[in-house]
Every structure is written in structure tokens, then in C-alpha cells.
From Swiss-Prot:
Entries under PANTHER family matching the protein: ISOEUGENOL SYNTHASE 1-LIKE, PINORESINOL REDUCTASE-RELATED
Keyword NADP in record: yes
Name of this protein: Isoeugenol synthase 1
Annotated organism of origin: Petunia hybrida (Petunia)
Database matches in SUPFAM superfamilies: NAD(P)-binding Rossmann-fold domains
Catalytic activity reported: (E)-isoeugenol + acetate + NADP(+) = (E)-coniferyl acetate + NADPH
Role of this protein: Involved in the biosynthesis of the floral volatile isoeugenol. Catalyzes the synthesis of the phenylpropene isoeugenol from coniferyl acetate. Phenylpropenes are the primary constituents of various essential plant oils. They are produced as antimicrobial and antianimal compounds, or as floral attractants of pollinators. Isoeugenol is a characteristic aromatic constituent of spices and a floral volatile compound.
Disruption phenotype: Accumulation of eugenol but reduced isoeugenol levels in flowers.
Tissue-by-tissue expression: Expressed in flowers, especially in corolla and tubes of petals, probably in both epidermal and mesophyll cell layers.
Length: 323
């Protein structure tokens, strides 16, 4: 039985964002596939349980390495859309994915792993800029290969950064403010990022465009976030400020991967990079405008979730820079 919807393959399906992507694809009615690394004897039990859950939802699972070119080509010929949610250490491995997509010749849309800042229009401190540069390499390689694409700029993930900034699971009354706390950022709930991505990946309007997820209710500063959390909990938080100069110094002096974390905090919450450019009609699509009937979770609504049962996000992983 055919649904008329594109067959979607997720790379990195068992990772943090990949899990959301698989479930969004299923819920939106797409035949859904996952390409995952072969299981080992010491594979994590949680991964095994997740794969069983995927299978129970009807997900078709392929096992293989990204280095297995012929296997990738064969798998890609079975689907219409490839969405990568590979982690930072694997970004450049997507060059192998691009080569396989090019040879397969049937993929209608490729969404490379980004889901952060708009890499072509922001600059960052060196440690974070290196991450952005790798994403740019994948964009250029995708374009050069002539593969239909949608690049997704998700800005910041709500569950991840609310946990990092407000510590709702620990019920902490102390928070750290980076810089003045006034710079605006965009926080989007992971479920919404996945839903918008799946919608755009099978939408002709989003072909060869940048999807920027920037809903108006999710544009907040650190001080806005603290104020909203105080109203939600009825408590008063004690704020400690770290200056821009201190953050820059930390990004230059502390060990990996904390130096990348410092660079990211500077870029988002001090430089305000996510609000530093205007969207263009011929290049960009704003997700909440493209899909006005989709009810996204606002930051304030997410904080109410945290009051009852705060999610536990997974910390991001980064590749050790070569020397």
C-alpha cells in the first residue's frame, strides 16, 4: 500500500536528534527507514531498545558503515529522501554520503546534518567557526554534486539549552548569564525541529532553499528566559554574570571540548548571531510562515513541561581538532 509520501531514510537515527526525526517521519505518514552502524556485542542496551521501538513503529532498519559505498548506494535506491542527523565528529563523513547519493541517482532531496546556526551568514570564535566551516564544506559539496537539497537552520534546541542554562532537573536557584543577557536567540523544541524538517524534506517549495526555524514566540534573551522561568516556578533566581572578555579568554585557554562550548555560548548569547541577518525571499524560508497550521511549542509552553517532567537531553559531542 502506497501513501503517496516520500520514503525517508534517516542517517544517525539512534542519536539525539535522530530519534526525534524518526518519530516525526512516522507520525507524518512517511515510509521510514534508518541506516545504523552494525550492532556489537557490547552495544548499549538503550540503543538495542530504541531499535526495537523503531521496528515496532514500522521502521525498516539497514545496518552498515558509512564507508560501505556499494551498500549505501543500494540502500539509497530504495528511498526518495535522505536526512542526515550525524553528530559533529561525523560531519565530513557526509562526503561519502554525497558520493553515494550521486551514484544512486534517484534521491529527490538531501538534508545534511546542520540543525544549528545559519552557517553561511554568521561568524564565530575560532573553535566554533571550525565546526561551522565543516558544515559549509558539506553544503558546497552537495551543491557541486547537483543533488536537490534543503539546508535546515534550526538555531538552538530548546530542551538542550534550557537544561544547560536553567538546570530545571536540578531545581537550581542559581543561573549563569553570559554577557549582559540581553542578546536575542532562537530556541526551538526538538520535536518541532524534526516535524518542520520532515515537512520541508518532501515539500517542492523547500527544494534548494534554506529552511530557517525562527518562530516569533521562540525569540528570547537569557534574561527573558530567566524571567519566564521565575514566573513559571514562582521562585527568584540568583544570577551570576560572565563577561564577554572572560568567555573569549575561556575559548582560547580551556581544554577541548569545553573551549567549543564557550565559543558557542559567545556566538549565540553574546554576539546574538542568530538574529544578526535578514531573511531573503529568493534564498530563505521561515518554517512557521511556511507551515502556519503547525502548532509549535513556544519557549513558555516548554517551560511548563519542565515544571512537571523536565526532559534530559544528551550533551553534544565534538571531534578533537587535528594538530
Amino acid at each position: 500500500m502506497t501513501t503517496g509520501k516520500g520514503k525517508i531514510l534517516i542517517l544517525g537515527a539512534t542519536g539525539y536528534l535522530g530519534k526525534y526525526m524518526v518519530k516525526a517521519s512516522i507520525s507524518l505518514g512517511h515510509p521510514t527507514y534508518a541506516y545504523v552502524m552494525p550492532l556489537k556485542k557490547n552495544s548499549d542496551d538503550s540503543k538495542l531498545q530504541l531499535l526495537k521501538e523503531f521496528e515496532s513503529l514500522g521502521v525498516t532498519i539497514f545496518y552498515g558503515e558509512l564507508s560501505e559505498h556499494d551498500k549505501l548506494v543500494a540502500v539509497f535506491k530504495e528511498v526518495d529522501i535522505v536526512i542526515s542527523t550525524l553528530a559533529v565528529p561525523q560531519y565530513l563523513e557526509q562526503l561519502k554520503v554525497i558520493e553515494a547519493i550521486k551514484e544512486a541517482g534517484n534521491i529527490k532531496r538531501f538534508v545534511p546534518s546542520e540543525f544549528g546556526n545559519e552557517v553561511d551568514r554568521v561568524r564565530a570564535l575560532p573553535r566554533f567557526q571550525a565546526v561551522l566551516d565543516n558544515k559549509k564544506k558539506i553544503r558546497r559539496a552537495t551543491e557541486a554534486a547537483g543533488i536537490p537539497f534543503t539546508f535546515v537552520s534550526a538555531n538552538s534546541l530548546t530542551a538542550y539549552f534550557v537544561d544547560y542554562l536553567l538546570h530545571p532537573r536540578q531545581k537550581s536557584e542559581q543561573v549563569t548569564i553570559y554577557g549582559s543577557g540581553d542578546a536575542k536567540a532562537v530556541l526551538n523544541y526538538e520535536e518541532d525541529v524534526a516535524a518542520y524538517t520532515i515537512k520541508a524534506a518532501d515539500d517542492p517549495r523547500a527544494a534548494n532553499r534554506v529552511l530557517i526555524i525562527k518562530p516569533p514566540k521562540n525569540i528570547v534573551s537569557q534574561l527573558d528566559l530567566v524571567s519566564s522561568w521565575e514566573k513559571t516556578t514562582g521562585s527568584t533566581l540568583k544570577m551570576t554574570h560572565i563577561s564577554e572578555q572572560e568567555i573569549i579568554k575561556l575559548s582560547e585557554s580551556i581544554n577541548f571540548p569545553e573551549n567549543i562550548h564557550a565559543s558557542i555560548l559567545h556566538n549565540i548569547f553574546i554576539a546574538g548571531a542568530q538574529l544578526s541577518f535578514e531573511l531573503t525571499q529568493d534564498h530563505d524560508l521561515e518554517a512557521s510562515e511556511l507551515y502556519p497550521n503547525y502548532n509549535y511549542t513556544s519557549v513558555d509552553e516548554y517551560l511548563k513541561i519542565c515544571l512537571v517532567n523536565p526532559p534530559k537531553p544528551k550533551l553534544a559531542t565534538y571531534a578533537q581538532p587535528s594538530t
